[in-house]
Amino acid sequence: MSEGSAGDPGHGSSRQRAVHPENLSLGSSCFSPPVNFLQELPSYRSVARRRTNILSRDKQSGTLLKPTDSFSCQLDGGITENLNSQSIRKYALNISEKRRLRDIQETQMKYLSEWDQWKRYSSKSWKRFLEKAREMTTHLELWRKDIRSIEGKFGTGIQSYFSFLRFLVVLNLVIFLIIFMLVLLPILLTKYKITNSTFVLIPFKDMDIQCTLYPISSSGLIYFYSYIIDLLSGTGFLEETSLFYGHYTIDGVKFQSFTYDLPLAYLISTIAYLALSLLWIVKRSVEGFKINLIRSEEHFQSYCNKIFAGWDFCITNRSMAELKHSSLRYELRADLEEERIRQKIAERTSEETIRIYTLRLFLNCIVLAVLAACFYAIYLATAFSQEHMKKEIDKMVFGENLLILYLPSIVITLANFITPIIFAKIIHYEDYSPGFEIRLTILRCVFMRLATICVLVFTLGSKITSCGDSTCELCGYNQKLYPCWETQVGQEMYKLMIFDFIIILAVTLFVDFPRKLLVTYCASSKLIQCWGQQEFAIPDNVLGIVYGQTICWIGAFFSPLLPAIATLKFVIIFYVKELSLLYTCRPSPRQFRASNSNFFFLLVLLIGLCLAIIPLTISMARIPSSKACGPFTNFNTTWEVIPQTVSTFPSSLQTLIHAVTSEAFAVPFFMIICLVMFYFIALAGAHKQVVVQLREQLSLESRDKRYLIQKLTEAQREVRSQPASA
C-alpha cells in the first residue's frame, strides 16, 4: 500500500481529496485548463465588469470584497497605517484579530519619540474620558426609567413619541435659558435702567404724541372672576408683568463699566433661539434620515426583513407581544395590499385612469374648500374678537368675557378636531395605496394645524396695520385698538397655549378615563363595545405637541416667558399621556418603527419651525414697532436696531460688513453655494449608484454557495471516476 502510494502520488493525493473535499486544490491537474476557481463565481464576474471603479474606490476606502486568506496582508498593510487615528473597536474583526492589532499598536509605540507617545497616550485618555462621560450622561437623562418601561411594554414606536416629547422639554428649557440670560438677567442684576435715550431717532414731526400713549386699566373695585379671566387670557395684572413684550420698555441697562444694549440683546435672543432650534432639529433629522436611507429596500427584501428581523426584542409584556405579532401580520398584509394595488394600477385602462384622476381632482377641490372655510371662520372669529374685546368687554358677564377672549382659540380647536375626520373619509374614495393614504392624511392634517396659527397671526397683522385715520397713518399701525400690538399678539399666543393645554387635560380626564370605565364595566352593551377602548394614535399626539411648539416659537418674541410655560406644559403632558397610555389606551395596530417615527416627528417639527419663522420675520422687518411700549419704541421697525448698532462700529469693520452684505458679495456667494450643492447632489447620486451595485453584488453572492456546492460535487465525481478509468 505504501508502494502504491509512493509510486502513484497523484492517485494518493486524489484519494485524500475524495475523503476531504474541502481540501481540494482547485488549481490541480484535476481541472484542465487550470484556472482560478474564485473567478468563476457569479459575484466575481459582476465585480469584473466594473473593476476600474472598484479599484479606484478601494484606494480610498479599502477593498470591500477580499478573500479571507489575504487578511494578514490587510493587517500588515492598510489597517496598521490607520491605527494611529482610529480605535480598534471600530473594525469589524473577531477578538483574536483585534488582539493582534493591539499588539501591533503596542509594538509601534516603542519606536516613537516621547512626545509622540505622550500625544498618543493623551488622545487615548481623552477618548476614554469622553466615553465615560457619555455613559454617565445616559444615566442622567430625563425620564430614562419611565421611557424604558414604556419601551418594554409598548414597543419602540410609542417610546419614540415620549422621547420626542422629552426633546421638546429640553429644547424649550434651553430657549428659556437663552432669553433669561440675554434679556431678563441683566434687568434683574441692576436697578439702573435707561429709558428713551435715543428718542431723537424718530423725529417728533413724523410721529403723533398719541402714538406714545399706552392706557392701563384703572385699579378700582375688581371682581374675583376678573383675576381668573386675567390668568386665562393674559390681560389685567399679567399684562404689566415680564410675561409680555410691553414690560421691557427699556433702552439699556447701566452697569459700572458699560451700558447693556437691551434692544439688541432682545433681537439677538430671538435669532439665537430660532437658529438653535433649526440646527438642533436638522442635526437630529439627518441622523434619522441616515437610518431610513440605510433601511431603504426593494419590495422583495421588505418581506424578508419583516419575517426574519421585524421582531421588537424590547417587548417584555405578553399582551404587547401578541399585539406586535398582529402588527407584523398587518404590515405583511398591507404590503401585499400595496402590491395588489400596484398591479391593479399597472392593469388600468385609459378610461379608468381618467375617471380616477377626475375623481381625485374633485375630492381635492373639496379638501381645499374645507380648508378655505376653516381659514375664513378663523379670520371672522379673530376679527370679531378683536373688535368687541376693547369695546364691550367691561359690560359683559364672566361667561361672555371668556367666550369673546377665547373665540379664535375655540374655532381653531374645532377646526383641528373636525377636519381630520373629513379628510379620513375623503381619502378612502381616492383609491390610493394604504401607506400613501396614511402619509397624505397626515400631511393634510399637518398643514391644517399649522396653517391655522399662520391665519390667526396674519389676521392680527392685517387688523394691526389697517389704518382709518391720520393718527394711524402717523404711527404706522392702528394705535387706537392696538397701543402695544406686540403684547396683544403675545396674549393671543398665550391663550392658544393655555386653551390647548386645557383641551388635552379635559379630553384625558373627561373622555378617555370614562370611556375606559364604560368599556370595562359595561361589557354587555354592544354600542359601548363597538366604541371600544381608546387607541394611542401616535401621529395625532405628535401633531398636537408640534402645534403647541409652533405656538411657542411664534409667541416667544412677544411673550419672553412663554418657553418656560411650554416647558411646564410639556412636563405635565408627559405624565398625563403616560397615565393615559398605561390605564386608558391601547396602542394602535398600525405601529411605527422608532427610526421612521423619529424622522417623521422631526420633519413635521421642521415644517412648524419654518412656518413660525415667516410671521416673525414679517413682524420684525415690515410692521412698525409700537411707540408706547417695548424695547424698540425708538426704532421704526425691530430690525433697525441692527444697522444702528453697526453704525457704532469702527469704519473698517463697517466697510467689511457692508461688503459682505452687499449684492456684489451675495451673488458670487450664491453661485458658489449652488456649485457646492450640485457637487454634493452628484456625489449623492454616485453613492446611490454604488449602493445599488453593492446590493446587486450581495444578491449575487447568495448564489455562490449553490455554485460552490455544484463545483464540489463535480470535483468529487471526477475524482471518483479516475480510478475506474485508470
From Swiss-Prot:
Per the UniProt topology annotation, the Extracellular ranges are: 1-166, 239-261, 382-402, 514-553, 620-663
Q: Where in the cell is it found?
A: Membrane
Keyword Glycoprotein in annotation: yes
Molecular functions per Gene Ontology = ion channel inhibitor activity
Source species of the chain: Mus musculus
Instruction: Provide the membrane-side ranges marked Cytoplasmic in the record.
Output: 188-217, 283-360, 424-492, 575-598, 685-726
This one is known as Transmembrane channel-like protein 7
Keyword tRNA-binding annotated: no
Q: Which UniProt keywords apply?
A: Glycoprotein, Membrane, Phosphoprotein, Transmembrane, Transmembrane helix
Q: Where are the transmembrane segments?
A: 167-187, 218-238, 262-282, 361-381, 403-423, 493-513, 554-574, 599-619, 664-684
Xref: InterPro entries: TMC (IPR038900), TMC_dom (IPR012496)
Chain positions with Phosphoserine modification: 87
- State a GO cellular component annotated for this protein: plasma membrane
> What does the function comment of this entry state?
Acts as an inhibitory modulator of Piezo2 mechanosensitive channel in dorsal root ganglion (DRG) neurons through physical interactions or interference with the interaction between PIEZO2 and the cytoskeleton.
Bilayer topology annotation: Multi-pass membrane protein
**Encoding gene, per UniProt annotation:** Tmc7
Name the organs or tissues of expression: Ubiquitously expressed. Expressed in dorsal root ganglion (DRG) neurons and satellite glial cells.
In terms of superkingdom, the source organism counts as Eukaryota
Which protein family is it in?
Belongs to the TMC family.
Phenotype of the disrupted gene, per the record: Conditional knockout mice in nociceptive neurons display increased sensitivity to mechanical stimuli and comparable sensitivity with heat stimulus. Also display increased chronic mechanical allodynia in DRG neurons. Also display increased proportion of PIEZO2-conducted rapidly adapting current in DRG neurons.
Where does the UniProt entry place glycosylation sites? 23, 94, 636
Q: Lineage of this protein's species? A: Eukaryota, Metazoa, Chordata, Craniata, Vertebrata
